[in-house]
């Protein structure tokens, strides 16, 4: 392979390294800004459970190092979540030069909407699901059982719920992409509504902890988001995409001829 052939690859690798470093720096900077408030952040996240615990019950730490490492771990996860827009922008900046004009027009709204939907999903979990789920679980504890949740186990539980609801709220973005690529159409999706409803409960069962309450609270919003995605996908059907591709291809060929 000649030097001329390897030059583009080296350029791309250098650009990729730059974008990865920017992502790492963003996470580290946010983490350093938040680490001082690590205990406050954990208290904020644990508040929905503490409010539902019986009087006199508290959270416990079954590991010697848990009181120190668990809030730090949570703070790092929060830093990753808050830096998501920066990470997505770096991904966009890396792939943008290789995209057609019509693809660039679609990517920016998708990046913005996917970030917003992810945060909305997490907020829905915190403000709606957590109080209902923890209240239900605490009230159904057998008589004589002292409810004292381990702080590390609680973190794993709530992060699983946060991720499940954040990812599930991306359903409209996924549907728009599928219709834009021509893989499916709004008409086909409307015909499959019964299967989607069943699938939403199956996904809720797989993504959430093993209690029917959390599964239902995830499945119902997922189906509603499916309907929202079907509504907006009619503006991004494959025919329009094909026309845009043809126009961009013609523009590229004209530039090449010149």
Curated annotation (Swiss-Prot):
Alphabetical UniProt keywords: Cell inner membrane, Cell membrane, Membrane, Protein transport, Translocation, Transmembrane, Transmembrane helix, Transport
GO biological process: intracellular protein transmembrane transport; protein transport by the Tat complex; response to radiation
Compartments where found: Cell inner membrane
Stated consequence of mutating residue 94 to A/L: Loss of function
Variant or mutagenesis effect after changing residue 94 to A: Export of TorA restored
InterPro entries: Sec-indep_translocase_CS (IPR019820), TatC (IPR002033)
Disruption phenotype: Disruption blocks the export of at least five twin-arginine-containing precursor proteins that are predicted to bind redox cofactors, and hence fold prior to translocation. Disruption does not affect the Sec pathway.
Entry function: Part of the twin-arginine translocation (Tat) system that transports large folded proteins containing a characteristic twin-arginine motif in their signal peptide across membranes. Together with TatB, TatC is part of a receptor directly interacting with Tat signal peptides.
Protein name according to UniProt: Sec-independent protein translocase protein TatC
Taxonomic path: Bacteria, Pseudomonadati, Pseudomonadota, Gammaproteobacteria, Enterobacterales
């Amino acid at each position: 392979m000649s030097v001329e052939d390897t030059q583009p690859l080296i350029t791309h690798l250098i650009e990729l390294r730059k974008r990865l470093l920017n992502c790492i720096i963003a996470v580290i900077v946010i983490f350093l800004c938040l680490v001082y408030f690590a205990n406050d952040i954990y208290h904020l996240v644990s508040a929905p459970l503490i409010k539902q615990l019986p009087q006199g019950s508290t959270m416990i730490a079954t590991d010697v190092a848990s009181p120190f490492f668990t809030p730090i771990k949570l703070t790092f996860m929060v830093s990753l979540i808050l830096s998501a827009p920066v990470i997505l922008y770096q991904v966009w900046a890396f792939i943008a030069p290789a995209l057609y004009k019509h693809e660039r027009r679609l990517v920016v709204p998708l990046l913005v909407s996917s970030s917003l939907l992810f945060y909305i999903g997490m907020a829905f979990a915190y403000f709606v699901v957590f109080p209902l789920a923890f209240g239900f679980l605490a009230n159904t504890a057998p008589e004589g059982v002292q409810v004292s949740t381990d702080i590390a186990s609680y973190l794993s539980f709530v992060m699983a719920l946060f991720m499940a609801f954040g990812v599930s709220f991306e359903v409209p973005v996924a549907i728009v992409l599928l219709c834009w690529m021509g893989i499916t159409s709004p008409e086909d999706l409307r015909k499959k509504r019964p299967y989607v409803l069943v699938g939403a409960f199956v996904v809720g069962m797989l993504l959430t902890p093993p209690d029917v309450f959390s599964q239902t609270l995830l499945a119902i919003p997922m189906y509603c988001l499916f309907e929202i995605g079907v509504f907006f996908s009619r503006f991004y059907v494959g025919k329009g995409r094909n026309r845009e591709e043809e126009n961009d291809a013609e523009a590229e060929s004209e530039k090449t001829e010149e």
